[in-house]
């Protein structure tokens, strides 16, 4: 489910940005329709999902990664060198700046998704492990990549705070920019901080990089299903049997958004929650593995406990999950989040998961002594 969600959001987002780039370049007609570009991306996804990882993207992926890093550096450099932009001092603005007063806990941790911790990245472990020469490279590749992505997320957060108007302590300017869509906001930030060069980098960094993540997601979904169903993937016919349903679901969600009957922000939130929940599960699994290997398991057990609280709290509070049952609505609109119920449930769930883990470790230790 997560992998298909990843593929979907990384098809719809780039398609929207391409449309923005085309419109701002003076184009019109078919080239300025999201559906057109979405279909092109989905066709590419089908080809990339069908063939091996090294057939298309394996050799040029590092180039796109470098472009993404250069774009992030360019954004922060553009902020620091322009006296009109000032990043708000963190302690003076240590408050909820969301115009709609959406709770920071745990919406912020779900929204940032891959910028903090990513279950999706863990699904790529089997593929990436085959690309490394030794286990020691795992620290640099996996941990290093997540730290790098976290820095990029912080840069974009800083850009959102520095470039847009803050009214009465709320990020009203950023909310207005995002009202035109995430693609328009990305285009605006790159244009303001880097000019024409920024727009070109946005094309590479925010269009091509997500697309390459999307094709990886769909390919991984195919391989995961193949493992579950014991379907050999050497045969092109067997690959096709899995490619069609996997891409079919992604196409339904993506085209549904392009045609206006599926909300992209809802797809993104479901992806984000699924992503962080998988991260929680993997952290608990890693904790038990480290315990059995007689290594320091607290380095994963502590973040696993934290992510348990994050995932559970969001599931209870979010309108697209259980929020409609406990939050306050007026005339069909959300007016208040019931944090008094959601926060304790999230904390209790996290404590219960930690207690279950500790019980499992003691049970394993006792069985080893017997």
Question: Where are each of the predicted segments found?
Answer:
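Helix-loop-helix connectors at the membrane interface of multi-pass transporters/channels
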Residues: 12-36, 127-150, 185-188, 214-242
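Select transmembrane alpha-helical segments in multipass membrane proteins
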Residues: 1-2, 37-40, 98-113, 154, ...
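Transmembrane helix-bundle signature of multi-pass membrane transporters/permeases
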Residues: 112-115, 142-150, 206-209, 304-307
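Helix-loop-helix junctions that connect adjacent transmembrane helices in secondary transporters/permeases
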Residues: 159-204, 213, 217, 228-234
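Extracellular/periplasmic helix-exit of transmembrane alpha-helices
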Residues: 76-92, 145-188, 255-262
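Helix-loop-helix module between adjacent transmembrane segments
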Residues: 1-49, 113-117, 205-215, 234
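A generic transmembrane alpha-helix motif of multi-pass inner-membrane proteins
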Residues: 48, 58, 67, 74-84, ...
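Membrane-embedded alpha-helical segments of transport systems
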Residues: 1-8, 144-156, 245, 275
């Amino acid at each position: 489910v997560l992998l298909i969600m990843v593929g979907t959001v990384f098809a719809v987002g780039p398609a929207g940005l391409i449309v923005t780039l085309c419109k701002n370049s003076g184009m019109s007609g078919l080239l300025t329709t999201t559906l057109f570009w979405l279909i092109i991306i989905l066709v590419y996804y089908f080809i990339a999902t069908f063939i091996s990882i090294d057939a298309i993207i394996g050799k040029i992926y590092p180039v796109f990664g470098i472009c993404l890093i250069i774009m992030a550096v360019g954004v922060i450099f553009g902020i620091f060198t322009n006296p009109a932009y000032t990043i708000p001092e963190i302690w003076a603005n240590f408050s909820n700046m969301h115009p709609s007063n959406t709770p920071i806990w745990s919406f912020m941790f779900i929204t940032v998704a891959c910028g903090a911790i990513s279950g999706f990245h863990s699904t790529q472990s089997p593929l990436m492990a085959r690309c490394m020469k030794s286990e020691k490279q795992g620290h640099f590749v996996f941990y290093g990549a997540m730290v790098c992505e976290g820095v990029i997320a912080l840069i974009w957060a800083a850009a959102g705070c520095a470039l847009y108007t803050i009214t009465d302590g709320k990020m009203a300017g950023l909310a207005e920019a995002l009202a035109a869509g995430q693609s328009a906001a990305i285009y605006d930030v790159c244009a303001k901080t880097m000019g024409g060069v920024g727009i070109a980098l946005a094309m590479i960094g925010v269009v091509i990089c997500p697309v390459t993540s999307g094709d990886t997601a769909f390919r991984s979904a195919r391989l995961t299903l193949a493992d579950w169903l014991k379907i050999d993937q050497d045969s092109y016919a067997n690959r096709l049997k899995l490619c069609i349903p996997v891409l079919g679901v992604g196409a339904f969600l993506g085209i549904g958004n392009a045609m206006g009957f599926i909300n992209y922000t809802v797809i993104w939130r479901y992806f984000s929650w699924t992503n962080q929940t998988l991260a929680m599960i993997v952290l608990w699994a890693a904790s038990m593995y480290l315990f059995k290997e007689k290594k320091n398991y607290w380095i994963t057990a502590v973040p696993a406990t934290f992510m348990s609280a994050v995932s559970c709290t969001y599931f209870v509070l979010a309108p697209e999950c259980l929020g409609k049952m406990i939050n306050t609505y007026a005339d069909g609109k959300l007016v208040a989040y019931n944090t008094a119920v959601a926060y304790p449930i999230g904390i209790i769930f996290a404590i219960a998961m930690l207690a279950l883990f500790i019980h499992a470790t003691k049970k394993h230790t006792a069985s080893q002594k017997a």
